[in-house]
């Protein structure tokens, strides 16, 4: 990689800068053009980069105002075996919106390994205003990325050659990917429906049996009046049965409660009789004891009398 005609402008002393600013006010707009040519050959691995920078005789022309807008113009020439016609893009400074023009994009043909290729890029920077700030522009070297191109089995047909269209950008350069005109349509896929859904879509047929005139079923005659009376009778019977069962339950419960009370009275009476019998037994025991005492006393008395008489 080699650089040609490269000039770097450095700042001068204070006395020369005053003269430069005075002369620059009376001079027209300046133009700086940078031309970069790149040659690529697949057979050789050498890549040569030649840069040419054309600068006016006056060094003060390189001073660009910081607040002044820049107009950048980039022109790209296609490679010999590649026919490109990119659509020009216009970027508005105020709205910053891209407006692509309607130009067809030609397909890219594959590169052969033996044929050389060349590409040239030209960049033009134009200053439209002047400000006191000093900005020095120096060329910079940027590496070039080489991407291999995969050859397809069937090369696309090459359309007729057309002249390159310029791309005008303001403030910044945007790269848009190329889109091929030939787009493969999607392969239609067969739609499969399950057997259950197919069966559900078919109308269901109910098997019916044909009857002759003699075998026809008799039609039911609606008895609305009799049915209503039967319903009323059933309802009344249910109500009466419920009331009777409730009354019987209440009466049985009342009788049982009365019998319980009577039994409690009888039990109390029996308890009182038992108590009286116990008292009677005690009285009888006391009487027996008294009788025995009287007997002993009488025997003692008779014995004493007999002894006295003897």
From Swiss-Prot:
Matches recorded under InterPro entries: BLOC-1_complex_su-3
Coiled coil: 268-299
N-terminal signal peptide: none
GO terms under cellular component: BLOC-1 complex
Region listing for Disordered, in residue ranges: 1-53, 78-127, 153-217
Compositional bias of kind Low complexity: 94-126, 164-184, 192-208
Entries under Pfam families matching the protein: BLOC1S3 (PF15753)
Keywords: Coiled coil
Comp. bias regions, Acidic residues: 11-25
Compositionally biased residues, Polar residues: 37-49, 78-88
Stored PANTHER family: BIOGENESIS OF LYSOSOME-RELATED ORGANELLES COMPLEX 1 SUBUNIT 3
Protein name: Uncharacterized protein DDB_G0292106
Annotated source species: Dictyostelium discoideum
Classification lineage: Eukaryota, Amoebozoa, Evosea, Eumycetozoa, Dictyostelia
């Amino acid at each position: 990689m080699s650089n040609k005609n490269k000039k770097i402008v450095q700042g001068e002393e204070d006395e020369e800068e005053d003269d430069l600013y005075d002369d620059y006010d009376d001079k027209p707009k300046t133009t700086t053009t940078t031309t970069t040519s790149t040659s690529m050959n697949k057979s050789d691995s050498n890549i040569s980069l030649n840069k040419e920078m054309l600068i006016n005789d006056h060094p003060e022309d390189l001073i660009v105002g910081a607040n002044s807008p820049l107009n950048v113009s980039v022109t790209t020439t296609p490679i010999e075996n590649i026919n490109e016609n990119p659509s020009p893009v216009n970027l508005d400074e105020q709205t910053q919106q891209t407006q692509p023009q309607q130009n067809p994009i030609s397909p890219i043909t594959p590169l052969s390994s033996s044929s050389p290729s060349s590409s040239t890029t030209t960049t033009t920077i134009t200053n439209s205003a002047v400000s006191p700030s000093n900005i020095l522009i120096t060329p910079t070297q940027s590496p070039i990325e080489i991407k291999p191109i995969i050859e397809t089995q069937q090369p696309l047909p090459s359309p007729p050659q057309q002249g390159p269209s310029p791309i005008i950008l303001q403030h910044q350069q945007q790269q848009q990917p190329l889109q091929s005109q030939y787009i493969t349509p999607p392969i239609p896929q067969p739609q499969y429906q399950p057997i259950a859904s197919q069966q559900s879509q078919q109308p269901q047929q109910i098997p019916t049996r044909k009857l002759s005139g003699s075998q026809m079923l008799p039609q039911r005659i609606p008895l609305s009046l009799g049915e209503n009376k039967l319903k009323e009778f059933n309802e009344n019977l249910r109500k009466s049965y419920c009331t009777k069962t409730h009354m019987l339950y209440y009466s049985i419960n009342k009788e049982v409660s009365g019998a319980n009370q009577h039994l409690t009275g009888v039990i109390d009476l029996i308890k009182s009789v038992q108590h009286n019998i116990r008292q009677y037994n005690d009285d009888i025991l006391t009487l027996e004891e008294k009788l025995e005492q009287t007997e002993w006393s009488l025997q003692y008395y008779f014995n004493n009398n007999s002894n006295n008489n003897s």
